[in-house]
């Protein structure tokens, strides 16, 4: 009961407190003390299940839905912040020092709306290197962690062109999802060879030239 009260108050305070929000300001503007907010923030909370219940009330069950994923850069200075590192900032168009979160949302295609379900902080490159993993491996691990809750909602995951890689697409397929995205600007597309076999020794010809996306050969 006490956690529920603090939880509701915290949501209200996040909407009304101007500028920076921390435990000191929560205690100043709220009815509970700073220590109370600190203690309750250490407790685990299933945000994904909570937001899925909210989505059930907002979106119609018969509507077409898809899962959206999108990493977001957060500006952050300092040296002791866990997993601070260099991440891509879409707004700046460059890699910047700070934090990154992996956002997971639920798209209602018929309502043209999206609701945030979960945000997971991305590990920095040093941590990933020590684990022998890449950032794409981390993204797949996050989706795998929540797949039991996401698959009943939708098997389609929508993402930008960064995720249009074989390793990521295959990883999603192994988890039971399908990726909806666009090809990267540097994609290497090839025509399949449709001619007759030569009968010569060696591996049969598989591809027949590179595709010029600005002038594709429609006869093939």
Sequence positions of predicted segments:
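Electropositive, glycine- and tryptophan-enriched low-complexity nucleic-acid-binding patches
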Residues: 25, 36-38, 90-153
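Short, glycine/acidic-rich beta->alpha junctions
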Residues: 18, 47-50, 96, 161-164, ...
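An internal, acidic/charged active-site-proximal segment
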Residues: 124-220
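Active-site-proximal, Lys/Arg-enriched surface segment
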Residues: 13, 40-112
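Gly/serine-rich nucleotide phosphate-binding loop at the start of the catalytic core
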Residues: 1-47
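Short, conserved acidic/polar surface loops in the N-terminal third of protein domains
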Residues: 77-83, 114-117, 131, 169-170, ...
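Short loop/turn segments at strand-loop or loop-helix junctions that form parts
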Residues: 69-72, 117-123, 184-185
